[in-house]
Amino acid sequence: MLLAKTPCLLLVQVIAAGISFALTSLQDQCETLQHNSNFTGLACNASIDMIGTCWPSTAAGQMVARPCPEYFHGVQYNTTGNVYRECHLNGSWAGRGDYAQCQEILKQEKKTKVHYHIAIVINFLGHSISLCALLVAFILFLRLRSIRCLRNIIHWNLITAFILRNVTWFVMQLTLSHEAHDSNVVWCRLVTIAHNYFYVTNFFWMFGEGCYLHTAIVLTYSTDKLRKWMFICIGWCIPFPIIVAWAIGKLYYDNEKCWFGKKAGVYTDFIYQGPVILVLLINFIFLFNIVRILMTKLRASTTSETIQYRKAVKATLVLLPLLGITYMLFFVTPGEDEISRIVFIYFNSFLQSFQGFFVSVFYCFLNSEVRSAVRKRWHRWQDKHSIRARVARAMSIPTSPTRISFHSIKQSSAI
């Protein structure tokens, strides 16, 4: 039995010796800190706690912060957090340090994954709600021919651009698997091209909205002289060569991962991001001039056209910062701390996915012309069906009283 226990005892002794050597080494380091510190009053001596954190000599009444341990019992921890321990007024350490900020890296990754999964749900929910609202708005502009003026045609095209962008977003999410993403097949690159094209058209149609309002209000130029083809060129045609140039750049300099994302040191995405930033800045200038004119010259005016312009400006003032802020989020890197990353994930997911919903609300559902036309259609439908109901009731009257009265008339005439 003694012979059987001897190897085990030797192993235990070796491990104990190793731990003792490590603790002695750490203790020596802490004692070195003790000798290097100069305190005249009461102070806590340098010491090592049970976890292995070295606490330097500290003046009484002070709180000490030390980095979290990198490893403990084979588990890796995030060293960006701190451990806190108080040196009491009597020169003795608190019983144990506060390790609340020291979190396992795997545990943090699990938390981040949970938040990413929630963000994916928000994205799908937001894009679904946006797509439904945009389709309703599209049908309203399609059916209500009485309100089909240039201003509403621009709204209609903006809504169409958002519909196509949402559709291509769903196509990307449902078809671009990890295998397709890594293999960089042709069809997945075409899907990315389509999504980026419709993404750019959103901003150029917003630019068309700004051009129309700036021309009508600031330049006092008759909108009757503006032509639909001008805005079609701005919204649909100009983004096309921009995306073609971007695709050529991707093909030669960053031809991987379905052209989604970017390689470090390669800036081909700025081929389409640059024009988008430019039209956003121009739109901000347009809106500044429009608001200035409205506040100075049109404040006392109550004409119906001026009221429509004011409402359009309000909608654009709300939507343009919304679109601009969400786009600029791509250039913002969240901080290293967990809270800033979580806030960034949720904020970005919400604004990106609900853009189409906000566009349909401000440019269609809150549009007084659309609401008036829908109300007229509804009243016309009610009147039409009420007439049909009256005719149906008249046709359903029994004929027996008519025959009786006719027989009585015949008898009276015979008498």
Swiss-Prot record:
GO biological process: adenylate cyclase-activating G protein-coupled receptor signaling pathway; cell surface receptor signaling pathway; cellular response to corticotropin-releasing hormone stimulus; corticotropin secretion; regulation of corticosterone secretion
Segments on the Cytoplasmic side according to the record's topology features: 143-149, 219-225, 296-306, 369-415
Signal peptide: 1-24
Quaternary context: Interacts (via N-terminal extracellular domain) with CRF and UCN.
Glycosylation sites noted in the Swiss-Prot or TrEMBL record: N38, N45, N78, N90
Domain notes: The transmembrane domain is composed of seven transmembrane helices that are arranged in V-shape. Transmembrane helix 7 assumes a sharply kinked structure.
Function: G-protein coupled receptor for CRH (corticotropin-releasing factor) and UCN (urocortin). Has high affinity for CRH and UCN. Ligand binding causes a conformation change that triggers signaling via guanine nucleotide-binding proteins (G proteins) and down-stream effectors, such as adenylate cyclase. Promotes the activation of adenylate cyclase, leading to increased intracellular cAMP levels.
Primary site of residence: membrane
Similarity section: Belongs to the G-protein coupled receptor 2 family.
GO molecular function: corticotrophin-releasing factor receptor activity; corticotropin-releasing hormone binding; corticotropin-releasing hormone receptor activity; G protein-coupled peptide receptor activity
Entry GO CC: neuron projection; plasma membrane
Protein name: Corticotropin-releasing factor receptor 1
Extracellular face residues: 25-111, 175-189, 254-269, 332-338
Cell compartment(s), UniProt: Cell membrane
Keywords: Cell membrane, Disulfide bond, G-protein coupled receptor, Glycoprotein, Membrane, Receptor, Signal, Transducer, Transmembrane, Transmembrane helix
Bilayer-crossing regions: 112-142, 150-174, 190-218, 226-253, 270-295, 307-331, 339-368
InterPro entries: GPCR_2 (IPR050332), GPCR_2-like_7TM (IPR017981), GPCR_2_CRF1_rcpt (IPR003052), GPCR_2_CRF_rcpt (IPR003051), GPCR_2_extracell_dom_sf (IPR036445), GPCR_2_extracellular_dom (IPR001879), GPCR_2_secretin-like (IPR000832), GPCR_2_secretin-like_CS (IPR017983)
Disulfide bonds: C30-C54, C44-C87, C68-C102, C188-C258
Topology of this chain in the membrane: Multi-pass membrane protein
Source organism: Xenopus laevis
